[in-house]
């Protein structure tokens, strides 16, 4: 079976494509694909942007506190799950609270390598095309709580 490929088209006309790895994080990928196919992410923003680190989106409230109404098991080493994918530039990973099994819909794309996240968060895919779109989001001017002043919206 081929790995799923997802495309994020941005309001500014740029886009990026990511390959997802179900052999590394099967439940995480199944959840993410379900959200993409249901158009959950359409119209949402990247609400947290830290250049040289990551861009984060997937919150329907745009506040950093929202989700889909459910949580999934965290597929990462700290939670007893072997996930060898490193948090390198372009890698997709699930955001969560301090609770290990609290991921739902919020995800982040690594703008740079961040080895300190390895084993702490469920990495599950990698940008294979359009890192320039990720770079553009990461370069957006931000205000309080690393929120872009100009919304970085997914179509």
Predicted regions and their residues:
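Cyclophilin-like peptidyl-prolyl cis-trans isomerases
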Residues: 1-155
């Amino acid at each position: 079976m081929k790995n799923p490929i997802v495309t994020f088209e941005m309001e500014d006309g740029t886009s990026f494509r990511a390959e997802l790895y179900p052999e590394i994080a099967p439940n995480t990928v199944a959840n993410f694909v379900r959200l993409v196919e249901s158009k959950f992410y359409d119209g949402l923003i990247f609400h947290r942007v830290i250049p040289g680190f990551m861009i984060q989106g997937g919150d329907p409230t745009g506040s950093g506190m929202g989700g889909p109404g459910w949580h999934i098991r965290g597929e990462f080493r700290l939670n007893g799950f072997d996930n060898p994918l490193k948090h390198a530039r372009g890698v997709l990973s699930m955001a969560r609270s301090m609770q290990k099994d609290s991921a739902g819909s919020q995800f982040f794309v690594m703008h740079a390598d961040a080895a300190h996240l390895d084993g702490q968060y469920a990495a599950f895919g990698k940008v294979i095309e359009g890192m320039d779109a990720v770079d553009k989001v990461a370069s957006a001017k931000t205000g309080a709580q690393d929120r872009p002043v100009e919304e970085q919206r997914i179509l």
